[in-house]
């Protein structure tokens, strides 16, 4: 339900040496009780701190759709593979931990935004560390989202020729107009670019709801195929028939692992982290949320993360219990191309990732504008040029780079822990003043430990990944 929002009184500039204006301090106290939503209202006679340069018009439900769509992405196709290399119980435990940690990190971000009245990720970096912090944050956001956009276009590049070839009864490898490189350029120009040129993110909520519907159809189909196929695989690990599996196949391949650790953890854990990154999109969605408060936005985040945790868990579990240890990094490759239901699933996934690209493009453009044009008014030529240049660069990357696996692993091991763990924790330590939270208070100790956890996660993941690259295990595993 859309509600008309009133903008609160102007907030004074906070000081970084430990003091806040009365209005800002009151607003901070109202919002700091915890990262789960509560029923406490604003203190009597006080107005909550509001963002002043934009009056949000996006409803609560549409914001949930936008953030859910920002969370849900190409990583969902690799979660069954991640479960195959961690085990059912270990995977679900890791997935739950990452979901809870993501919610906590959003709490840290929203607290910082409420304290200083800033709702742009890169501006929080500037407030915490000056111009250098702004540049570092902008670079991390751009790299992560370029990686996300690349993974979406990789899916289009690999799946769209198969879909069109199936409809036209043609060989995708033999006809020049079915080449993936040509098709991603056409999709980028005809579909993605027009959506990316919208001025406000809220309008994309309608495409977000459609995208989430497509991925829900993907989940339902994976569950259905589990019960239809059982565990039937051919010698090349691709499902060929819809008949019960022979006993020997079940004995050799169809045994679920509850807990396991192997060298592919260097890819599986980053895939899970990559699957929950939505932090660059949180503050833009917060800006456009109608009647924005920290509790209201935290409720949006909790609902979105909870829904995606359920969807991820079900998809990974039923996908893994269909293919077990033979499952590939992109689960759709396991199904036969002639299956009508899977053909519809491929269409749904293609539609979902295509409509997600414009949502991911928004924070990249915001970061570049804050970095390169901080004092410039809105300009349509600049708005269009940034979107066009970004799409050109990502298309070149997708055309030149042959595999999606190392992008998943590298982005999930570098920018993902930076955005989930490290940046929110250091922002909290630097921005929240000492008179609100002393340096050795429990919330700041928690934030410090959270940041250290992110550094350890990054170091361990990169260490395993570089070891795999050095020994050639990545290539031998088909990456």
UniProtKB/Swiss-Prot annotation:
The record marks 471 as: Involved in pH-sensing to the transport activity regulation. Signal peptide: none annotated. It holds the Pfam family Aa_trans. One of its GO terms (molecular function) is amino acid transmembrane transporter activity. Disulfide bonds join 231-254. Its main location: membrane. The chain crosses the membrane at residues 59-81, 98-118, 136-156, 177-197, 203-223, 265-285, 303-323, 342-362, 384-404, 407-427, 447-467. It is found in: Cell membrane. Glycans are attached at residue 236. One of its GO terms (cellular component) is plasma membrane. Highly expressed in neocortex, hippocampus, striatum and spinal cord by astrocytes (at protein level). Expressed in brain, lung, stomach, kidney, spleen and testis. Expressed in the cerebral cortex between the second and third postnatal week, where expressed exclusively in glial cells from postnatal day 14 to adulthood (at protein level). Expressed in the cerebellum at post natal day 12 (P12). Expressed in liver. Expressed inside the cell body of the astrocytes. It is a multi-pass membrane protein. Coiled coil: none annotated. Keywords: Cell membrane, Disulfide bond, Glycoprotein, Membrane, Transmembrane, Transmembrane helix. InterPro entries: AA_transpt_TM. It catalyses: L-serine(out) + Na(+)(out) + H(+)(in) = L-serine(in) + Na(+)(in) + H(+)(out); L-alanine(out) + Na(+)(out) + H(+)(in) = L-alanine(in) + Na(+)(in) + H(+)(out); glycine(out) + Na(+)(out) + H(+)(in) = glycine(in) + Na(+)(in) + H(+)(out); L-glutamine(out) + Na(+)(out) + H(+)(in) = L-glutamine(in) + Na(+)(in) + H(+)(out). Not inhibited by lithium. Partial allosteric regulation on ions sodium binding. Residues 1-58, 119-135, 198-202, 286-302, 363-383, 428-446 are cytoplasmic. The keyword Transmembrane helix applies. Belongs to the amino acid/polyamine transporter 2 family. Symporter that cotransports neutral amino acids and sodium ions, coupled to an H(+) antiporter activity. Releases L-glutamine and glycine from astroglial cells and may participate in the glutamate/GABA-glutamine cycle and the NMDA receptors activation. In addition contributes significantly to L-glutamine uptake in retina, namely in ganglion and Mueller cells and, therefore participates in the retinal glutamate-glutamine cycle. The transport activity is pH sensitive, Li(+) tolerant, bidirectional and associated with large uncoupled fluxes of protons. This is Sodium-coupled neutral amino acid transporter 5.
